[in-house]
Amino acid sequence: INFKKANILKLKKLNTSYDVIVSNPPYIELNEKKIMSKNVLGYEPHEAIFVTYDDPLVYYKKIILLAEQMKTNKSKVYFEINPKFCDDLKKHFLTTSFNDVEVQCDIFGKERMIKATNE
């Protein structure tokens, strides 16, 4: 197991191939802050929660780009996702070699996790 700590948006490439990439990037838009629970807002760093770019999928797209460059024969990418962007993220995956896409719901029935495999 290798862990990589980096500013993903500044990273140009990964130095090794990966079988599995797991990420929980920022995916909450700032306008959703008012509906967030206080226990999340009080204990999580805001830069870990809120995406402040025009494209809310910016982190996902960059990770997928890097994964494309460094994949193995059966690489998998796992993300926690914002349900409102699930369809857009699935469509983006289908434009890559990670075209076997599964979505899992959380305990409340919301689309929350996505797995993509390059099989």
Name each model-derived stretch.
Residues 1-118:
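S-adenosylmethionine
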